[in-house]
Amino acid sequence: MKSELIFLPVPAFGHLVGMVEMAKLFISRHENLSVTVLISKFFIDTGIDNYNKSLLAKPTPRLTIINLPEIDPQKYLLKPRCAIFPSLIENQKTHVRDVMSRMTQSESTRIVGLLADILFVDIFDIADEFNVPTYVYSPAGTGFLGLAFHLQTLNDDKKQDVTEFRNSDTELLVPSFANPVPAEFSPSIFLEKDGRHDVLLSLYRRCREAKGIIVNTFEELEPYAINSLRMDSMIPPIYPVGPILNLNGEGQNSDEAAVILGWLDDQPPSSVVFLCFGSFGSFPENQVKEIAMGLERSGHRFLWSLRPCISEGETTLQLKYSNLELPAGFLDRTSCVRKVIGWAPQMAVLAHEAVGGFVSHCGWNSVLESVWYGMPVATWPMYGEQQLNAFEMVKELGLAVEIEVDYRNEYNKSDFIVKADEIETKIKKLMMDGKNSKIRKKVKEMKEKSRVAMSENGSSYTSLAKLFEEIM
């Protein structure tokens, strides 16, 4: 009888890719294991369709992809942003139940576990109906995971209203961080007084029911955070199995990628600063102009992934930028040293020898990718847990320089503008070998550690072996 794991990823590109690549890793490491991935359609992230098609075009043995029936987007897009994915999975419960029912009726299959993205943990209700063990996948780092559990504990056990931390100078003593953490670096949703924080807190309560939490990180990157969570008897066992990355670039637009990489081929080694802010990383026009002026004044070559703003309620991400957002004459004046694009093949760009620095929103996947390729980072977090990731990269790990950690851009409502002078200064600091050699050295060392972690007998390799012992 074959052993089957069911994976339920959130249909946002970074979340989905991480879980599918993890499924491939599991299969490669255990010959008696198969994985079925259940994918929901999500109207905002168009990159998912391309990635999905690439998976179906190149099937992997023992990996089954099932596309769940589409849900009317009005049933979840009208919810507050933090509730979109929990609402989506609530509407998919019937379909997940049908899949699990068919699988349990098969005499040749034994479901050994259901692994759900942390935003989909309410699906545990369905797993419980079939007495299937449940596991959580955290696409964010262990530091953030520790903060989330800490806030949930403060709220539930200490009766602390965590929304009072909003706009406060409070510093939190979070077990997963060696340094005091400014409370304002918590994801804004945790601090909202309109009840939205309850949605997030409920997810982390539910996480505690799981038999284990699988995290896309590795021991050498977050030793303090990982050890702190393992010492907490109220938190399920932690399994760091990363870095898990989309190294083959499935789902990318090969024609656009070829043009971008061709331009990089013509640039000197380590001469280009790459700016990319994730799927939802867009700026209002006044901030775009400040970035443009800062880049021009820095004198460095640059590759800038610039996306137009997305408004609340929009159902599709826009991948192209408008020249109208840029300062007059900017493209002409910088034509010899720049390339401004919409979508970017981020992994391939970071791997290119022409790139010498990365200005990033500090989404956790981007953090892992920068470490894997030994790329120094200048942090510019925008939303979600990114402020905390930036704090961890700069203050805890010493792997990045800071452009701005206080910037927040929720649907482009930020009134705070980072000025061109500061952008110019920080880009020069990022790209200058002299003043920044310590960070470059640490990043290169962590690059080697990340690869050792995934190799035989490495920390993540061993952690996955322990997980298999638990599951099988």
Swiss-Prot record:
PANTHER family: GLYCOSYLTRANSFERASE (PTHR48048:SF45)
Record organism: Panax ginseng (Korean ginseng)
Reactions it catalyzes: (20S)-ginsenoside F1 + UDP-alpha-D-glucose = (20S)-ginsenoside Rg1 + UDP + H(+)
Gene Ontology molecular function: UDP-glucosyltransferase activity
UniProt name for this protein: UDP-glucosyltransferase 103
Record key words, sorted: Glycosyltransferase, Isoprene biosynthesis, Transferase
Binding residue positions for UDP-alpha-D-glucose: 344, 346, 361, 364-366, 369, 385-386
EC primary class: transferase
